[in-house]
Amino acid sequence: MTRRLVVIGNGMAATRLVQRLVERDPARFAITVVGDEPHPAYNRIQLSPLLAGEKTAAQIPLLPAEWYTRHGVCLRSGEAVDEVDIQQRRLRIAETWLPWDELVFATGSRPFIPPLPGIDRPQVMPFRTLADVERILAIPGPAVVIGGGVLGVEAAAALRRHGGEVTLLHRGSGLMAPLTDAFAADELRQQLEARGIRCVLACSIAAID
């Protein structure tokens, strides 16, 4: 008997899971995918090239829309799960209850937002989703990137490609630690500064004005 499988999340892991399930046994599950982003599933790794203008939004979807229709997968984009009832095996989306036999959480991670005064200003935003990229690109002028990890470095480099002033703030003494040693971190800093990116290391942020 076909079982009802609901996947909460429409990111890269969820999409790959659904693809494999359909490939292995298309009749085993009636699959529903629920994702709170209004866009089709996309390659999140490509957000930095998108921010830099090297890619377009049309180039980063993981699957075409017709794939879901062709394989009988129900895709509910732009919808958030408000409640999960484990006992009755159902979940609530707004006022609608959706039953399931098997449930998969594939929601991914969330960026850490430091609890700083001024963090809620409209010009302050994370760098995690396609909507974040659209919001960042909509605001002209100098940019400050908080965090010198992989995404922070990529975001700073991408923003600099647009010609604006970019400052990268990092609380550690070396960029992209622990992926880099002291020599590599310093070489990376020099490369960024050669591109015109100001790097401020070993700093702490008290507030955003």
Predicted feature residues:
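FAD-binding core/adjacent interface of flavoenzyme oxidoreductases
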Residues: 1-6, 61-144
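Beta1-alpha1 glycine-rich phosphate/pyrophosphate-binding loop at the start
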Residues: 2-74, 158-179, 183
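Glycine-rich Rossmann-fold phosphate-binding loop(s) that bind the pyrophosphate
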Residues: 9-12, 128, 146-151
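Conserved beta-strand termini and adjacent loop/short-helix elements that scaffold enzyme active sites
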Residues: 34, 78-80, 127, 150, ...
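Glycine/Thr-rich phosphate-binding loops of Rossmann-like dinucleotide-binding domains
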Residues: 113-114, 153-154, 177
